[in-house]
């Protein structure tokens, strides 16, 4: 039997009694955000909305975005990436489990020097798939010219944020390239590999 979303006690400032709120609501108040599924328009919009709202509330507190995602849609991913660059607080990105495809794109989009992978995390990069719309097969056809533009956009971001030469990134994106946490660090996708001594990160 599913247990639903766990609830935890939380006392709002000025309140005497704690109220039970769902755990994600509580974590969001601490600027802890989660991408733990395929990236689609819904989850992208939720994360964008949270970042914008919480930035209005307090522009000085950093975000911590935990990523365990097989990837997803390119356009929602680019929208989330752009929002991460737009909001005033720094966005720490933390890979736990897998950051593949657009998941790795979001990972590399964290504030430089504040991107981390857990020791046993995996990262995968590749070129964008041939369809980026959420639609029935055949309803939309991605023209080769548009796909090329998207690939150039993603490649340019990886080059800028990893410090790797264009030819290296382009070659890596020709196929699925899986990286360990330390390999992702060597590639410039993350800056740190976490260990047991980093429990006070957040």
From Swiss-Prot:
Reaction catalysed by this enzyme: Hydrolysis of proteins to small peptides in the presence of ATP and magnesium. alpha-casein is the usual test substrate. In the absence of ATP, only oligopeptides shorter than five residues are hydrolyzed (such as succinyl-Leu-Tyr-|-NHMec, and Leu-Tyr-Leu-|-Tyr-Trp, in which cleavage of the -Tyr-|-Leu- and -Tyr-|-Trp bonds also occurs)
GO biological process: protein quality control for misfolded or incompletely synthesized proteins
Primary enzyme class: hydrolase
Keyword tRNA processing: no
One of the record's GO cellular component terms: chloroplast stroma
A Pfam short name: CLP_protease
Name listed for the protein in its UniProt record: ATP-dependent Clp protease proteolytic subunit
Organism field: Acorus calamus
Gene that encodes the chain: clpP
């Amino acid at each position: 039997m599913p247990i639903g979303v766990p609830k935890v006690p939380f006392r709002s400032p000025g309140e005497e009694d704690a109220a039970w709120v769902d755990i994600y609501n509580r974590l969001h108040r601490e600027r802890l955000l989660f991408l733990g599924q395929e990236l689609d328009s819904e989850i992208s919009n939720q994360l964008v909305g949270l970042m914008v709202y919480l930035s209005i509330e307090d522009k000085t507190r950093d975000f911590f975005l935990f990523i365990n995602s097989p990837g997803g849609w390119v356009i929602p991913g680019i929208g989330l990436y752009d929002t991460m660059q737009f909001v005033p607080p720094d966005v720490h990105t933390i890979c736990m489990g897998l950051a593949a495809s657009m998941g790795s794109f979001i990972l590399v989009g964290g504030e430089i020097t504040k991107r981390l992978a857990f020791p046993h995390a995996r990262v995968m990069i590749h070129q964008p798939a041939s369809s980026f719309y959420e639609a029935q097969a055949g309803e939309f056809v991605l023209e080769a010219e548009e796909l090329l533009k998207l690939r150039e956009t993603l490649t340019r971001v990886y080059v800028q944020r990893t410090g790797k030469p264009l030819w290296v990134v382009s070659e890596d994106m020709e196929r699925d390239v899986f990286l360990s946490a330390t390999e992702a660090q060597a590639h410039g996708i993350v800056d740190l590999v976490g260990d047991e001594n980093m429990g006070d990160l957040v």
